[in-house]
């Protein structure tokens, strides 16, 4: 079986964690791990594992247009938009792990985009909440408001995450609206500096005129089982509670400890989702 030739651009926390995960998959082959600084930790780790590296950023792909079949963009929301035009001209599929809104929103347990050339993985909070919000939206009447609050350990947030917080909020809100058809929503991201570091946790508040509770609960638990197939440390920590027509629930995501420690579930959830999309495309 021919291996899937993969490129990764962006060698920070997300890109490096993704690299380690992909190296464990026999059917994937990382042809290039590309950043801007040869002395970065991510590039150093990639070199130690025998992966070809470059510090030329997008220029590497311009000069080597056939170097991969699919590229994961782990840079930042602004650069990802610029990169997308280049990859489109080269016929390279893009899985965008930045909140750029440059491609079609993708949540692997909700929609399949096998024929799309550019898929946007939204955000960690989006991947944590949207599968459940989508399920809930099918079992309530007149859903009017959604609020999603995520907290992640400050130590798990790299430079790109900090630069992209406004993009994070806007992109997650837009994706929630797309998947639930609720216009009024609010997204909050808290970077928690506590020591010891906190796990990623996402709390959802859903307001509707009424909820069809039994089918809703069945739908939620079935969706969690589905999510755990590709996000093994995803768990419901506060089951749904309804008070005054507002449903509240919380999930927690631990990491696998591939690059950063287990508290960095925000890396795991978006990277595992990106890998799941790739498997569905080429499976």
Predicted regions and their residues:
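Generic signal for short, ordered secondary-structure residues
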Residues: 24-26, 115, 155, 246, ...
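Metallocofactor- and cofactor-centric catalytic cores in central/energy metabolism, strongly enriched
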Residues: 8-9, 13-16, 21, 36-42, ...
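Short helix-capping/linker segments at secondary-structure and domain boundaries
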Residues: 140-142, 280-283
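Active-site-lining helix/loop region of Rossmann-like oxidoreductase modules
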Residues: 9, 122, 127-245, 257, ...
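N-terminal Rossmann-like NAD(P) cofactor-binding subdomain of oxidoreductases
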Residues: 2-145, 149
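Short beta-strand element of the conserved SAM-dependent methyltransferase core
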Residues: 106, 204-208, 251
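Solvent-exposed, flexible loop/coil residues
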Residues: 109-111, 264-267, 271-273
């Amino acid at each position: 079986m021919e291996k899937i030739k993969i490129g990764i651009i962006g060698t920070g926390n997300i890109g490096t964690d993704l690299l380690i995960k992909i190296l464990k998959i026999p059917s994937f082959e990382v042809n290039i791990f590309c950043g801007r600084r040869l002395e970065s930790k991510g590039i150093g780790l990639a070199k130690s594992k025998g992966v070809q590296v470059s510090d030329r950023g997008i220029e590497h792909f311009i000069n080597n247009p056939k170097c991969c079949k699919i590229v994961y963009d782990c840079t930042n929301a602004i650069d990802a938009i610029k990169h997308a035009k280049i990859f489109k001209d080269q016929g390279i599929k893009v899985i965008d792990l930045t909140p750029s809104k440059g491609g079609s929103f993708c949540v692997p347990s909700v929609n399949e985009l096998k024929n799309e050339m550019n898929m946007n993985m939204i955000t960690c909070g989006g991947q944590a909440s949207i599968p459940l919000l989508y399920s809930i939206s099918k079992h309530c009447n007149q859903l009017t408001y959604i609020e999603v609050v995520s907290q992640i350990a400050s130590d798990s947030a790299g430079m790109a995450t900090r630069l992209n917080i406004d993009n994070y909020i806007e992109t997650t809100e837009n994706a929630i609206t797309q998947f639930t058809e609720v216009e009024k929503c609010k997204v909050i991201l808290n970077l928690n500096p506590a020591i010891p570091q906190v796990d990623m946790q996402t709390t959802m508040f859903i307001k509707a005129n009424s909820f069809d509770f039994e089918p809703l609960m069945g739908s939620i638990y079935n969706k969690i089982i589905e999510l755990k197939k590709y996000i093994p440390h995803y768990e419901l920590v506060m089951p749904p509670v309804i008070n005054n027509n507002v449903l509240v629930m919380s999930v927690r995501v631990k990491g696998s400890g591939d690059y950063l420690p287990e508290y960095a579930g925000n890396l795991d959830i978006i990277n595992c989702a990106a890998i799941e999309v790739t498997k569905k495309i080429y499976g």
